[in-house]
Amino acid sequence: MSSLASKQGPRYRHTADSSEPYETIGVEKLTPIIGAEISGVDIGKLVSDEARSNRQMDEIHRALAENLVIFFRDQHITPQQHLAFGRKFGELHIHPAAPHEGDDPALMKIYADKDSPRANGEGWHSDVSCDLEPPMGSILYIRQCPPSGGDTLFANMYAAYEALSERMKSYLDGLTALHDGEQIYRGLYANYGVADPPAYPRAEHPVVRTHPVTGKKALYVNNGFTRHIIGIPRDESDAILNYLYKHAENPLFQCRFRWSENAIAFWDNRCAQHRALWDYWPHTRAGTRVTVKGERPV
């Protein structure tokens, strides 16, 4: 894995945003490149108080755009409040495979204990990128944590793209790749009694997408769902994708979030990847996730 360093200094040099100060929330960056903890927000009250909501929501939108993933601690919310918070960002996405909690299929169940055959999201990915219109964001609420471990890592795909050479950027711009959920999802949730549909989503997306809000370019391939680049021989595709996967996993682009009970993470799937660590067996980690619909990548 490259350090992106040279005798002339780092190949990738992050320039911090010169933003105006926030008025209704506190924003403490985890790293200069990705991630921030948000304070001064009570999400339970936010979803029920329109007077409070509008200004804070504007600043939460801004914090997400600037930091790609934001975290809220000590949030004691109900399932209905979790769903309502997600709906403030758009229509909710229904996962094509995962079990849900309660009556609303938009409330995805997140659970792993000593008897689980697997845990959600152990490899680097962008959520459900196999959909024709992949989700724009995911909001994960963890109610129960193991004594240690269970961290989630996030990586900045703007930075991953920007750190590529100009020749590589020129080559990738305009290419598309197939994202397919079949290998990932079929049989994945059999332990919950989930029956597989006849087919899972698959779609072609740009290898480099442009974020609809920020206008920035982001690398949009991931080891979980991307199968091959369209229009080139498979061996070339494999070599390029394997390079891009390793490049995107460089720690320089990452932050690592240590969970506490009743914490929330909200990440932008259009410009960030993530992976969960299952290093806490035989302990339990439990929560729910709400996912917001997105647009077709361009």
Annotate each language-model stretch with its function.
Residues 2-264, 269-298:
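Non-heme Fe(II) oxygenase catalytic core, chiefly the N-lobe of the double-stranded beta-helix
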